């Protein structure tokens, strides 16, 4: 990376520190359209997310700017994979990429990739958790489980992703194969430098309203004849190929409260940030592949929400979508109690590391919350967390089983 590229990156870092008090009147011109940069929303690595406004329509966007310095070709590939992931998973609880653009950096030979995403004014679940901690409040169990349920529906769209052919919508609604065939996706066109390629909705239309991003059918509206108890087997083996025929499971690999936006209705969750997404089933034949996967997890998966099998990847195993189930368990715990179960103050006092605690499954509920009776949340709620936080990935429930348990818990709160 040359000096000019370093200076350019330093500018973004400066804006990150000073926030909205700088560059509020800056105007960015892309493909003949002008966008006013209002403030910095977040940053990470070589990427920055800004609140941008179309000067013509006044519409607000979350503009993600990804720097890909010269000599780092892998960073371009990784950024493009993130764009493809947004287009691959079409679901009401998964964020849409409204438009994307690849441009040549004016400072060096690198590339800059812009992603136009919907702007959600209510922020993320992490913002709510932080506010609860500051104000001494907490999520009501029913509201929390409802948000968690919508998040699980998004994860199911990844874990049960069809190989090719039927659209995600067809799979969700149970459309017949004949109807699905008629609605095949043609696949996204290639991104060209200096030009955009909108998916189904562009910057000119649509909105990020709750109507557009509502959950699938609310479990409270389902048939009252639904069975009352959900039995979860102790073992969840990796399904044989015949059992997943037609499916291509993907794993998000970085599920956490900060990656769950809240739509304008303040109750519809929107799963975001697919830069870490990978095909779920990854065989580990040797130590080289094990170390590669371990390094990828260290780079892309937040430690407090990382599954134990990703801290020390073993040879002769297959990594699966069960890593997301663990992250969901940590996320639900954090929604209820303020932090991941493996980064609590109690653990810090004992000097334990997050990695060792996760690999040993060492966590506890806050005082008064672990008993069968009492506490702010039900025993059924705590049992849901316990099931997801099994150290052995084969013992964790599938995403469908998690959804079933969550719906059962919601029904019992009626």
Language model features by range: what are they?
Residues 108-124:
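Conserved short submotifs of the Hanks-type protein kinase catalytic core
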Residues 65-89:
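Conserved N-lobe beta3->alphaC-helix segment of eukaryotic protein kinase catalytic domains
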Residues 191-239, 246, 258-303:
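Activation segment/activation loop of eukaryotic-type protein kinase catalytic domains
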Residues 48-68:
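Glycine-rich ATP phosphate-binding loop
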Residues 1-30, 38:
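Juxta-kinase regulatory segment immediately upstream of eukaryotic protein kinase catalytic domains
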Residues 96-113:
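Short beta-strand micro-motifs within the conserved protein kinase catalytic domain, predominantly
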Residues 38-45, 49:
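Protein kinase glycine-rich loop
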């Amino acid at each position: 990376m040359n000096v000019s590229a370093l200076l350019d990156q330093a500018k973004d870092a400066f804006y990150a520190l000073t926030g909205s008090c700088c560059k509020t009147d800056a105007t960015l011109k892309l493909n003949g359209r002008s966008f006013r940069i209002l403030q910095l929303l977040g940053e990470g690595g070589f990427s920055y997310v800004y609140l941008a406004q179309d000067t013509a329509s006044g519409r607000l966007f979350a503009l993600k700017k990804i720097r890909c310095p010269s000599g780092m070709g892998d960073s371009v590939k990784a950024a493009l994979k993130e764009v493809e992931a947004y287009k691959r998973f079409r679901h009401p609880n998964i964020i849409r990429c409204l438009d994307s653009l690849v441009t040549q950096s004016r400072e060096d030979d690198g590339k800059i990739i812009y992603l136009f995403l919907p702007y959600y004014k209510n922020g993320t679940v992490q913002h709510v958790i932080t506010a609860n901690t500051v104000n001494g409040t907490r999520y009501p169990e029913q509201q929390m489980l409802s948000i968690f349920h919508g998040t699980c529906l998004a994860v199911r769209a990844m874990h049960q992703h069809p190989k090719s052919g039927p659209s995600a919508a067809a799979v969700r609604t149970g459309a017949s194969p004949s109807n699905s065939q008629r609605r095949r996706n043609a696949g996204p066109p290639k991104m060209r430098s200096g030009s955009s390629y909108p998916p189904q909705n562009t910057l000119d239309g649509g909105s990020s309203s709750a109507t557009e991003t509502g959950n699938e059918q609310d479990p409270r509206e389902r048939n009252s004849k639904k069975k009352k108890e959900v039995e979860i087997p102790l073992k969840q083996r990796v399904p044989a190929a015949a059992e997943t025929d037609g499916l291509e499971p993907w794993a998000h690999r970085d599920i956490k409260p900060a990656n769950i936006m809240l739509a304008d209705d303040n109750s519809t969750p929107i799963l975001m940030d697919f830069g870490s997404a990978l095909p779920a089933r990854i065989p580990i034949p040797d130590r080289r592949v094990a170390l590669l996967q371990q390094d990828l997890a260290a780079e892309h998966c937040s430690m407090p929400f990382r599954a134990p099998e990703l801290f020390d990847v073993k040879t002769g195993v297959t990594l699966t979508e069960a890593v997301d189930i663990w992250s969901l368990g940590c996320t639900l715990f954090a929604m209820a109690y303020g932090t991941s179960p493996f980064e609590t103050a109690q653990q810090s006092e004992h000097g334990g590391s997050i990695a060792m605690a996760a690999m040993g499954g060492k966590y506890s509920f806050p005082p008064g919350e672990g008993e069968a009776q009492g506490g702010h949340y039900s025993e059924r709620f705590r049992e849901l967390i316990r099931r997801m936080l099994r150290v052995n990935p084969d013992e964790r429930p599938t995403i469908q089983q998690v959804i079933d348990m969550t719906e059962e818990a919601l029904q019992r709160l009626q």
